[in-house]
Amino acid sequence: TFTAEFIIMSGTYNFFPSKDFNSWRLYFCKSLKTLWSKTTCAMIFNLQTSDQEKITDGGIVYTSKEEIENFCKSNFGNVKAVINPAIPKDVTFVIKKWS
């Protein structure tokens, strides 16, 4: 097993080879819970967001920013969503184990 101060995932959860959104959500949630147990400082990841959760024909996952924030708050504590106005659908989530 390993531990790390920071775990950063860029693009990791933006593609899924199936259009089954529930399967993606299970994979995503299980993965974050596993990685959270291995970080000592913070976990950072990005997702594509949309008002309607979906997986496109090309496999790109769009999820709800609010749903992700709620999941992270209830499982890990405080979460910060960072949005760059130049790419507003790409949201970076930062979850710290310390203040």
Language model regions located:
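Short "lid" loop at the C-terminus of a central beta-strand within the Rossmann-like core
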Residues: 13-15, 48-53
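Charged helix-capping and loop-helix junction motifs
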Residues: 22-31, 61-65
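Conserved beta-strand signature within the Rossmann-like core of class I S-adenosyl-L-methionine
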Residues: 31-49
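Core SAM-dependent methyltransferase catalytic element
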Residues: 80-99
